[in-house]
A protein has these predicted regions:
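Extracytoplasmic "Venus flytrap"
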Residues: 29-35, 113-122, 196-199, 330-350, ...
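Short, solvent-exposed amphipathic alpha-helices that sit
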Residues: 79-83, 119-159, 178, 182, ...
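Hydrophobic alpha-helical segments within soluble ligand-binding/sensing domains
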Residues: 64, 70-104, 123, 176-180, ...
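Hinge/cleft segment of the Venus flytrap/periplasmic-binding protein
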Residues: 103-108, 112-116, 120, 132, ...
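Hydrophobic alpha-helical
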Residues: 32-39, 128, 149-152, 157-231, ...
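Positively charged n-region of N-terminal signal peptides that target proteins for export
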Residues: 2-12
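C-terminal motif of bacterial Sec signal peptides marking the signal peptidase cleavage site
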Residues: 24-27
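Flexible loop/hinge segments that line or gate small-molecule binding clefts
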Residues: 35-78, 97-108, 226-234, 238-239, ...
Length: 407
């Protein structure tokens, strides 16, 4: 009897020691098992900056959600200027007799607008119109004036024949199919008055080229440097585009999260691995600037045309980013529209390439580009993740996501 109790007592005591040790590990252990509330976890908005869709004012309530909230995108205003300069440079060296198709002394163009409530679209529209002297103080598709521009040493009057927001039948913006339909209508309506086509992005530009009656040889400009657009430049179908350095953006999104998850604070969050080498020896090759007032990291833009398109061919990844030995962390990332050409063909592949190098286990959920609920309904099981990256359907929906992180 004594032997029986003695043996079992040892087991009980041993079990108690194990349980006590486990409790100690949970309550006093290292940061790996420390419970962090969702509201305190790193949050990065990317590609679609939280802002008012009418005024363009940055939504600082969302940006100040916590001390670990940032935005990663590109220099929208600078990008609009780059696209405008790309167009001006092309026209300056062009033959006016070729550009002015009907010889009326007028350069007529049509404009594909992505989303009148999106800061990037607004900036690109402004850059285009400033370059062509048709800017009238507003990015509104209908608020425009006549201008003038140098074409091969000759001054031509410039008329925006029509500007239109490309909204699909499902309500989605930046819609390539809508651009195809619009171009078909424009070609019929304006005929040889159309001397140039300009688009807020490559997806819509490529959509225009899909129109069966697209006027052959008419120059067309896009924006994003998507793979199909780059190939179209090489084939002579697209005249030019703008690279917003998608690899720099995707890597910066992941790098900021990595820095925050590694416990970095202050300026180290937006410089380590971005403008200076991080502890793993990584540094993004392309320039990325930090704007303190809006907590935004912005990649710089560059023009792409027939003289340099081969530099931007798909598959050229940033060699400055190498495999790290950092602890693996889980990140939940939303994509506002699974059908968005830039995100699906360029941004998401870049994320999927760099995330494993930074030891980030990325879970991507995608929306329909129309309803915020298509993303938010998948923004779930938040306690299973160490950080979040958000790409909203509407730029003023930041609070819809942060409300989910309160609990």
């Amino acid at each position: 009897m004594l032997s029986f109790f003695g043996g079992n007592m040892k087991k009980v005591i041993l079990a108690g020691v194990v349980i006590a040790a486990a409790i100690s590990a949970v309550s006093c252990g290292g940061k790996n098992v420390a419970k962090v509330a969702n509201k305190d976890k790193p949050l990065v908005f990317y590609n679609r900056q939280p802002s008012d869709p009418v005024s363009g004012e940055i939504d600082m309530e969302s940006m100040n959600w916590n001390g670990s909230t940032y935005y990663v995108g590109f220099d929208a205003a600078g990008g609009g200027a780059v696209q405008g300069q790309l167009i001006k440079d092309f026209l300056a060296s062009a033959d006016p007799a070729v550009i002015d198709r009907n010889g009326d002394g007028i350069l007529g163009y049509v404009l594909c607008v992505g989303d009148v409530g999106h800061n990037d679209s607004r900036a690109r529209t402004e850059g285009i119109r400033r370059a062509l002297d048709t800017w009238n103080g507003s990015p509104d598709p209908t608020n425009v004036k006549d201008g003038s521009v140098n074409v091969g040493g000759k001054t031509l009057k410039v008329v925006e024949l029509e500007g239109k927001a490309m909204t699909g039948t499902d309500g989605s913006t930046w819609n390539a199919n809508a651009a195809t339909d619009a171009m078909s209508g424009w070609a019929t309506k304006f005929a040889d008055q159309i001397d140039m086509v300009v688009s807020n992005n490559d997806g819509m530009a490529m959509g225009c080229l899909q129109a069966s009656n697209y006027p052959a040889g008419v120059p067309i400009f896009g924006y994003d440097a998507n793979a199909d657009a780059i190939e179209a430049i090489g084939a002579g179908r697209l005249t030019g585009t703008v690279s917003q350095n998608v690899d720099a953006q995707a890597t910066a999104t992941l790098q900021v999260l990595r820095n925050l998850l590694d416990g970095l604070t202050g300026s180290d969050v937006y410089t380590q691995g971005i403008s200076t080498s991080d502890r793993y020896g990584n540094k993004i090759s392309a320039p990325v600037d930090y704007v303190n007032s809006t907590k935004a990291l912005l990649a710089q833009n560059s023009g792409v045309n027939s003289s340099n398109w081969e530099q931007y061919k798909a598959g050229n990844r940033d060699t400055g980013i190498k495999q790290t030995n950092a602890e693996t962390k889980k990140v939940l990332l939303t994509v506002y529209n699974s059908a968005d050409n830039f995100l699906s063909s360029s941004y998401v592949p870049a994320l999927n390439y760099y995330a494993p190098l930074l030891n980030i286990d990325l879970t991507i959920v995608q929306g329909d580009g129309q309803n915020e609920s298509s993303c938010i309904d998948k923004f779930t099981n938040l306690g299973n993740y160490d950080a979040y990256a958000i790409n909203m359907v509407k730029t003023n929906s930041g609070r819809d996501y942060t409300d989910r992180l309160k609990y």
